[in-house]
Curated annotation (Swiss-Prot):
Its main location: membrane. Plays an olfactory role that is not restricted to pheromone sensitivity. The chain crosses the membrane at residues 106-126, 437-457. Coiled coil: none annotated. Belongs to the CD36 family. It comes from the Eukaryota. One of its GO terms (cellular component) is plasma membrane. This is Sensory neuron membrane protein 1. Keywords: Cell membrane, Disulfide bond, Glycoprotein, Membrane, Olfaction, Receptor, Sensory transduction, Transmembrane, Transmembrane helix. The gene is snmp1. Residues 1-105, 458-540 are cytoplasmic. One of its GO terms (molecular function) is scavenger receptor activity.
Length: 540
């Protein structure tokens, strides 16, 4: 925090940033509570084209299907201001609306085959963490799947994403009832009727509460603007083996403090992945003709970064591969997060799956950011979710699965400000800065001219009566040389050749050349002095 910066300071009422605070009535507060435009939310799914081969331990082959385009609306409600702590408390709601017009030719009715998120997810986690329960869970899974014959799910795309896949929990057998009860308590399924549940990727989250947040408003310290204080009444997480990994670092990603520099990271904390991610400065950029800063994200390599060992299951031996993050502690399922198509990740991950084609343009994470105002003008947050698959030991159906990280889908959440918003940024910030700069230089120029003119006027007033003694030659003619070119106006010498009184007016060129010394010159002319023309030339 640079609270000692004279530009930033701690004055909450400083005019240059009072509209950026999350104080009631400010423009920023209204936009923070409800973004006035939807974010673009795109989903890409990976269809496994050879599930039978994979069930026998073969190499998976996938084909990407997408994008399925959604509007994502973010709204914060039930807001409470705490003046003493300078915090804002709110509940977040995310709403996704399918846009078939922007998804064409895709409709959501396409059939897709993927590793079964529910079956494999549950069995793999039990095998990893609670192996003693494997017989009970395996028996219950066989009953509700009636019976279990494969580790893959073939279903309609929109059922998988939002509408839901039916899970039969009508059996009264103990293992089946225990399994269904566990799935419900974990929030993996939602009730459909008395005997069935529904499972989907996003259905449970659509239009529902996404947690109770507390963030700083930035009134007392603008550099704290938007910083997460607590989530669901917890001031830190409790899922990693290390305090640093459990901290909330940064904002909720919809707002950032102003006056950042290229040395700062853009930090944001996300409950969807239970960790903070920091984007680093990547260079200068332009957006809509405006100068910007370009920030990029790197997931790093936890194995070779001791400060990130708290994200490892058993460091340094069991850590997520380079360019990935282990989401199992957060999601309760063997899910690995990465950039799409394993871009910027361990090459071994890409080699283990056919059909992936990573490239920077489509798969990197970026932000075009205006540092002074803290405004992201164009951004794409991209994350791929893959399942960490391995053989289920002693299982007749799932015992031959390969050990592989198999992509399920990836999501892109982004927005690019249109002309309405970039023009507002241009006229309120950039042109404002240019106007301020122009005013500053205009003030300097006018001040300089004023000094010169003022000096000239003072010079003129104080030199109205100067006694001049012309230097005569032996024959009575005026002296030539340096003094010959000097203009003297007033009375002519008297008949006795004595002195006369005449004002001396310097040229504009002389004034400009000597403007810095005008106060000294003027001081020397407080009263009339008897000087010769030659002396005046030498003096001025």
């Amino acid at each position: 925090m640079r609270t000692d910066d004279p530009v930033i300071g701690n004055d909450g009422d400083a005019p240059r940033y009072k509209n950026l605070m999350l104080k009631p009535g400010t423009q920023m507060r209204g936009m923070f509570e409800k973004i006035p435009f939807p974010l673009d939310f795109k989903l890409y799914l990976f269809h496994v084209t050879n599930p039978d081969v994979v069930m026998k331990g073969g190499k998976p082959r996938v084909r990407e299907i997408g994008p399925y385009f959604f509007e994502e609306w973010k709204e914060k409600y039930d807001t409470v201001d705490n003046e003493e702590d300078d915090t804002l408390t709110f509940t977040l709601k995310n709403t996704w609306i399918f846009r078939p017009d922007l998804s064409k030719p895709l409709t959501g009715d396409e059939m897709i085959t993927i590793p079964h998120p529910l079956i494999l997810g549950a069995l793999l986690m039990v095998q990893r963490d609670r192996e003693a329960m494997m017989p009970l869970v395996s028996k219950g899974m066989d009953i509700i799947m009636n019976p279990l014959t494969t580790g893959f799910l073939t279903t309609r795309v929109m059922d998988l994403l939002f509408d839901g896949i039916l899970i039969d929990c009508s059996s009264h057998e103990f293992s089946a009832k225990a399994l269904c009860s566990g799935l419900e308590s974990e929030g993996a399924v939602m009730p459909f009727n008395e005997t069935h549940f529904k499972f989907s990727m996003f259905g449970l989250k659509n239009g529902t509460d996404a947690g109770r947040w507390v963030v700083y408003r930035g009134v007392k310290n603008i550099m704290d603007l938007g910083r997460v204080v607590s989530f669901n009444d917890e001031t830190e997480m409790d899922i990693y083996d290390g305090d640093e990994c459990n901290r909330y670092i940064g904002t909720d990603s919809t707002i950032f403090p102003p006056f950042l520099t290229t040395k700062d990271k853009l930090w944001a904390w996300s409950p969807e992945i239970c960790r903070s991610i920091g984007a680093e400065y990547g260079g200068k950029s332009k957006y809509a003709g405006l100068p910007m800063s370009f920030f990029k994200l790197d997931f790093g390599d936890a194995r070779n970064e001791p400060e990130h060992h708290c994200f490892c299951r058993d460091p340094p031996d069991i850590c997520p591969p380079k360019g990935t993050i282990d989401l199992a502690p957060c999601l309760g399922a063997p899910i690995i997060g990465s950039k799409p198509h394993f871009y910027d990740s361990d090459p071994k991950l890409l080699a283990a799956v056919d059909g992936l084609t990573p490239n920077e343009k489509d798969h990197d994470v970026y932000i075009h950011f205006q540092l002074l105002s803290g405004t992201p003008v164009s951004a794409a947050k991209r994350l791929m979710f893959s399942m960490e698959i391995e053989p289920i030991r002693d299982h007749a159906v799932l015992g031959n699965l390969p050990t592989v990280i198999l992509p399920l889908f990836w999501a892109e959440e982004g927005a690019s400000l249109n002309k309405t918003w970039t023009n507002q940024l241009k006229y309120t910030l950039f042109l404002g800065l240019r106007f301020n700069t122009a005013v500053k230089w205009l003030t300097i120029i006018i001040g300089t001219i004023g000094t010169i003119v003022g000096g000239f006027m003072h010079y003129k007033r104080t030199t109205k009566m100067v006694n001049v003694t012309p230097v005569q030659s032996v024959n009575g003619s005026s002296a030539k040389g340096k003094g010959a070119g000097m203009t003297v106006v007033g009375h002519q010498p008297d008949s006795k050749g004595g002195s006369v009184t005449a004002p001396v007016i310097p040229s504009a060129k002389d004034l400009l050349q000597n403007s810095r010394n005008l106060p000294t010159v003027i001081e020397g002319l407080d009263k009339p002095q008897k000087v010769t023309v030659t002396e005046m030339q030498e003096r001025y």
